[in-house]
Regions:
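Conserved catalytic cores of phosphodiester-cleaving nucleases, focusing on short active-site segments
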Residues: 86
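Compact, Lys/Arg-rich rRNA/RNP-binding cores from ribosome-related proteins
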Residues: 89
Length: 116
């Protein structure tokens, strides 16, 4: 079984928003999120709830829970079995914040424009 490769979206200024988010997590939350990223890398587009959920416009969320802390990293699939991590947030409400999804869609469109 071929694995997928995970890459971080990089803005024109060189920032990697999902990586910044990951580094800001507590040690335990980061470790659990990295474990979930490895599962995503192995399963790719076959990964489903409770680990991953399709949101809209080609954007998915990786769902990680550590105690009462719930984090999400948004991502999309790209050619050559690539998973592009766009941004992340700590979940504080039942619904995924619309602005987080809109940001992920903007990053996705920018990535596609620059790499196709």
């Amino acid at each position: 079984m071929d694995t997928f490769s995970i890459v971080f979206y990089k803005t024109l200024s060189g920032e990697k928003p999902a990586k910044v988010f990951l580094n800001e997590l507590s040690h335990k939350q980061r470790a659990k999120t990295i474990r979930d990223l490895k599962i995503l890398e192995l399963c790719g587009n076959r990964l489903r709830e409770p680990h991953s959920k399709y949101l809209e416009d080609g954007i998915y969320e990786l769902r990680t829970k550590q105690g009462s802390n719930i984090s999400r990293i948004l991502y999309f699939f790209f050619v050559d079995r690539r998973i592009v991590l766009t941004n992340g947030f700590i979940k504080k409400s039942m619904k995924t914040p619309k602005n987080a999804i809109e940001l992920a869609v903007r990053y996705k469109n920018d990535y596609i424009e620059r790499y196709i």
